[in-house]
Amino acid sequence: MKKSVTVGVSVVMLTTCLAAYAQPPHTHRLEATPATVVYGYYWPEAQPVLRIASGDIIDVDTLLTNTPEGLAKAGVPDDEIQPSLKAIVSEVTGERRGPGGHILTGPVYVEGVEPGDVLEVKILSIQPALDYGYNGCKGFLPENCEAGAPAKIIRLDRRHMTAEFAPGIVIPLRPFFGSMGVAPAPELGRLSSNPPGRHAGNLDNRELIAGSTLFIPVFARGALFEVGDGHMAQGDGEVDQTAIETSLRGRLQLTVRKDMKLTWPRAETPTDYISMATDPDLTAATRTAVQEMVDFLVSTRHLTRHQAYQLVSIAGNVAVTQLVDKPNVGVHVRLPRSIFVGR
């Protein structure tokens, strides 16, 4: 009889645990306000604005990288400039500003995440928050830019997800967050939001659209995830330093991955596996990104290094992610998921 009671209690406990495990993730709303953003940096000592459990979802607002004055100079009417942008630029000043130019929503502390883990960021959805974006002109070959010209305002057709650049030139829109990252290694201190790195950050990778998953190595407890720098369309290279920049709303799911160990961020999109790297030297960044893809194939597809390297040459696509986020340029390698059949 005692044995039956013990078994019964064990079954109840197991059922309770399974029921708890099966609970849907909690969804948190995170608006962009002076109290919920950082301005221009990633930092392991930053205070989190939200704490969530691993696997939870955040519905997050992000703001474009500009100022009310800059938008007004470019011709945006005052009633189309977001009040939240006005408040943040006005109130987040002095020591609260870092060396970079991005307004980033966060940091978000993910419970249970430790240095050495990987943060999985599932990009569930991305929507534009405005009917316009802008493009500046600096970057890689600034001699092509007209001196003193204001940013170009580009109206967005949110219904058809297109934008008319000029009469007869229509751009398809593929929104993504230019900056998604975690706190860097402690020895790097308060790191500018401008250059990307091992912590991800300002990757400006046009492939990270809705339906993609970004995997980021973690360097600080809780990860301290930040997101911003919304882009509606961008070419590889981002040669003039800007995309179609705008404010975005996103739904992201953040999960700790203790089963993964990464040196650099990686990603999976609906169509590709992606390795990536950054470095002040383009050749060095390319070398690392290619090697990262080789290592990925060796560990996940059980190929020899010889085979993996050959496969990258046959089926991989090496691209310059961006040339303008000084001091680092970015390179990524895409490998089609469709080549892996019958497994």
Language-model-derived ranges and their functions:
Residues P99-I103, Y109, L124-I209:
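Intrinsically disordered, low-complexity linker/loop segments enriched in Gly/Pro
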Residues T65-P77, I126-G136, G222-M232, T321-V324:
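Short, Lys/Arg- and Gly-enriched loop/turn segments at beta-strand edges
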Residues L173-T283:
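Conserved mixed alpha/beta catalytic, RNA-binding, or beta-rich assembly cores of soluble enzyme
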Residues T65-N66, G70-E111, I123:
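Extended, compositionally biased flexible segments
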Residues P25-T27, E31-V37, E45-D59, L64, ...:
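Alpha/propeptide regions of enzymes that mature by internal proteolysis
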Residues G8-A19:
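Bacterial N-terminal signal peptides
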Residues M1-V9:
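Bacterial N-terminal signal peptides that target proteins for export
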